[in-house]
């Protein structure tokens, strides 16, 4: 049986090679080529084989070329193809019939079709669209224990009127959902959307399509599409039940995996130990969910852990959020620091007490009596001063010193 199949394959290859070398064999382009939007950021390309194509029992293929919004090309044996791409700028594609051999490829002419861009005034569509997802507990735990929440934010178009209102939709697979919970700016325009639970599969490889359109009485609002990889926007939850214990000079840290549909072995962890006293940060990359570290007994430490999904379970993603900090230890002064603080304080206290005792008991007067001032007899002498009316040119002051009993007359002075 196997030799027969090999003979048939060889014969077919020989026939195709002969056809390619035959100048009269002509490939005709497909017919009825159409492009139809089948969902948010999704189109279906369909065509039919040319009914006038000569049939010689050969395997015809089709070469599809995407011209806009982003160039791409591929081959297919089917007569239809599905494309996932933003459509707010329109879509254009071409297709042709091809016949391949080991040496060359014969191709027909191209046929093209396009999907025009939706109407709307320039500058009215949203900008800076960003989305993130989180794993949450499902409301139907017996069917599906985990679901995914979705939050998207955007900026209002620079030329959008003040009465513009935006509306968000997302599509994942065949399911489409409209946003019901919005956040608004000062002009009451929607600028963020929140889905507490969605149909998104955080383990899936399908792209998430987000579509935002709008309405206004003053202008036509141009819609906007954007595709997201669930892996790229998945925000891993922080590890749960982080516990920290201190025994002697050892720090024992343990935690549980984040709330996630992935099992325990699918996570890598990063541990951060921050010494609040000296500012030193210790970071450790771990696979296990426990860690032991040596510490001193005079510092306080802040402990945090975060997680990321590892490569065995899916393509590595970004790190998730840090867990809430846990503070352990009691900050105490070292012996040298205590000496530097206690000794000067004690010295000042002793001096203050001694000063108060001396003041109360008059010890300063007893220890350091005041030196008596020398006695002066001159102060005891009565002095009489007489004034005479001076002339116009001369002023004369006469001072008489009167001698008392037991004192020597000091004399008279005249100026």
Curated annotation (Swiss-Prot):
Pfam families: IL6Ra-bind
Tissue: Expressed on eosinophils and basophils. Also on B-cells.
Keywords (A to Z) from UniProt: Disulfide bond, Glycoprotein, Membrane, Receptor, Repeat, Signal, Transmembrane, Transmembrane helix
GO MF terms held by the record: interleukin-5 receptor activity
Transmembrane segments: 340-361
InterPro entries associated with the record: FN3_dom, FN3_sf, Ig-like_fold, Short_hematopoietin_rcpt_2_CS, TypeI_recpt_CBD
Main localization (coarse): membrane
Record motif WSXWS motif, residues: 319-323
GO cellular component, one term: plasma membrane
Gene3D superfamilies: Immunoglobulins
Signal peptide: 1-17
Glycosylation sites: 32, 128, 213, 241
Location of this chain's protein in the cell: Membrane
Highest taxon listed in the record's lineage: Eukaryota
Ranges spanned by the short sequence motif Box 1 motif, renumbered to the chain: 367-375
Membrane side Cytoplasmic: residue ranges: 362-415
Membrane topology classification: Single-pass type I membrane protein
Disulfide bond sites: 131-152, 179-193, 266-313
Domain Fibronectin type-III intervals: 29-120, 238-331
Purpose: Cell surface receptor that plays an important role in the survival, differentiation, and chemotaxis of eosinophils. Acts by forming a heterodimeric receptor with CSF2RB subunit and subsequently binding to interleukin-5. In unstimulated conditions, interacts constitutively with JAK2. Heterodimeric receptor activation leads to JAK2 stimulation and subsequent activation of the JAK-STAT pathway.
PANTHER family reported for this sequence: CYTOKINE RECEPTOR, INTERLEUKIN 5 RECEPTOR SUBUNIT ALPHA
Subunit structure: Interacts with IL5. Interacts with CSF2RB. Interacts with JAK2. Interacts with SDCBP.
Record-given protein name: Interleukin-5 receptor subunit alpha
Organism encoding this protein: Mus musculus (Mouse)
Gene name of this polypeptide: Il5ra
């Amino acid at each position: 049986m196997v030799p027969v199949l090999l003979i048939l394959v060889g014969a077919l290859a020989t026939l195709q090679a002969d056809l390619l070398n035959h100048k009269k064999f002509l490939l005709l382009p497909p017919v009825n080529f159409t492009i139809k939007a089948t969902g948010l950021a999704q189109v279906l390309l369909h065509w039919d084989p040319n009914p006038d194509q000569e049939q010689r029992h050969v395997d015809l293929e089709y070469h599809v070329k995407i011209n806009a919004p982003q160039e791409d090309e591929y081959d297919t044996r089917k007569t239809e193809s599905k494309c996932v791409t933003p459509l707010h700028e329109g879509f254009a594609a071409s297709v042709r019939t091809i016949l391949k051999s080991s040496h060359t490829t014969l191709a027909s002419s191209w046929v093209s079709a396009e999907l025009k861009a939706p109407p709307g005034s320039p500058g009215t569509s949203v900008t800076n669209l960003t989305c993130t997802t989180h794993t949450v507990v499902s409301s139907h735990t017996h069917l599906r224990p985990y679901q995914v929440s979705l939050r998207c934010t955007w900026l209002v178009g620079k030329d959008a009127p003040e009465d513009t209102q935006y509306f968000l939709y997302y599509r994942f697979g065949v399911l489409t959902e409209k946003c019901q919970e919005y956040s608004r700016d000062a002009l009451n325009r929607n600028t963020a959307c929140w889905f507490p639970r969605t149909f998104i599969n955080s383990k899936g490889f399908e792209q998430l399509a987000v579509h935002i359109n709008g309405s206004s009485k003053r202008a036509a609002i141009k819609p906007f599409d954007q595709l997201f990889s669930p892996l790229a926007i998945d925000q891993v939850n922080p590890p749960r039940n982080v516990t920290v214990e201190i025994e002697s000079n050892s720090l024992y840290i343990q935690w549980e995996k984040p709330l996630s549909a992935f099992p325990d072995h699918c996570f890598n962890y990063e541990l951060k130990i921050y010494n609040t006293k000296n500012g030193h940060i210790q970071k450790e990359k771990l696979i296990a969910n426990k860690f032991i570290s040596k510490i001193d007994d005079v510092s306080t430490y802040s402990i945090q852990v975060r997680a990321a999904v590892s490569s065995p379970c899916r393509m590595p993603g970004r790190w998730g959020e840090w867990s809430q900090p846990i503070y352990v230890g009691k900050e105490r002064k070292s012996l040298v620091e205590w000496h530097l603080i206690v000794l000067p304080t004690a010295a000042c206290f002793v001096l203050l007490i001694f000063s108060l005792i001396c003041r109360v008991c008059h010890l300063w007067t007893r220890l350091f009596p005041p030196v008596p001032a020398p006695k002066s007899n001159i102060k005891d002498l009565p002095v009489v001063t007489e004034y005479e009316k001076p002339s116009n040119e001369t002023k004369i002051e006469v001072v008489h010193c009167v001698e008392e009993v037991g004192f020597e007359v000091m004399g008279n002075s005249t100026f």
